Amino acid sequence: MITFLGLYDPVSSWLHLVSALGFLIAGFFLVRKAWGSKLRVAAMMLYTFSLVFLFSMSGTFHLLEYQTAGREVLQVLDHAAIWILIAGTFVPIHTLMFRGPKRWGVLLLVWLITIPGVVLTTVFFSTMPEWLSLSFYLGLGWIGILTAYLVVRQYGKKEARYIFYGGLAYTIGAVMEFLRWPVLVEGIVEAHDFFHVFVILGAGYHWYFVYEHASWPIYKKQIFIVKHNPDRTYFRAHAKGDCLRLESDSLDDLKIKMHKLIEEKYKGKLPIEKVILEFFEEEEVLF
């Protein structure tokens, strides 16, 4: 491998370091779009962490000199981060798109596989064959077939296309890595660099899917806090756990607006089962 500016794997290193910065910035937009629900925001933050952790560990590992302690440590962290990213990608998708067992059951399964996977990869890293570790990663990742099936069944094929694109990109990259093909410029642009390109592409497809759905309502019950002045000539409502706000000069009109808003917000998404209004009367204090 030919070094450049002190980077021992220059293409792979720069690709992933730039991607780490890019996904960190992109995470801000995810959180902003998800704002209003603590669960949504937590899912976006975990997902963003998994992306930044993987690409920063990988980018740093590839810039270090071969057969050094630092490179060996970061290589182990890099492989552990693959598990974290795969599991982390399931979190926002199942949080946003499903409820009940389809949400928590699948996430429990994924993390029950991921945690031992991280431990085994870390402990047996030096003795584990590459084909076995790649098989583990692909096996966990292709639980995404179940995710895609559930999305297709509930929302239609079009809604799941970016999940498929991302999974396909990851798989193509893994096959290239295993076959050590293609080699464009020996010592500079090799199969491993193409692998990184397809990892970025797969992560990008999945990020876009999550972003498209980041503001989806996730609760089956929506509570609105309704405030009004003493003579009931002004009403203002905001939703608990979501960024929904309404104003009106009558309660009946407020309810009509609320019905339209809920209908629009939940159209084609998880159905809402109940809307609850909690009233709060505003009172002026004179000094």
Name every feature range the model reports, one short phrase each:
Residues 1-218:
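Multi-pass alpha-helical transmembrane bundles in non-GPCR membrane proteins
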Residues 3, 180, 250, 254-257:
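Terminal low-complexity, poorly structured segments
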Residues 5-6, 230-232:
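Generic alpha-helix initiation/capping and coil-helix boundary signal
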Residues 95, 124, 244-246, 255:
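Hydrophobic alpha-helical elements and their junctions with loops/disorder across both membrane
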Residues 219-230, 245, 252, 256-287:
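Short, charged, surface-exposed hinge/linker loops at domain edges
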Residues 234-236:
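Short aromatic-glycine-enriched beta-strand elements
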Residues 238-242:
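Short glycine-enriched loop/turn motifs at secondary-structure junctions
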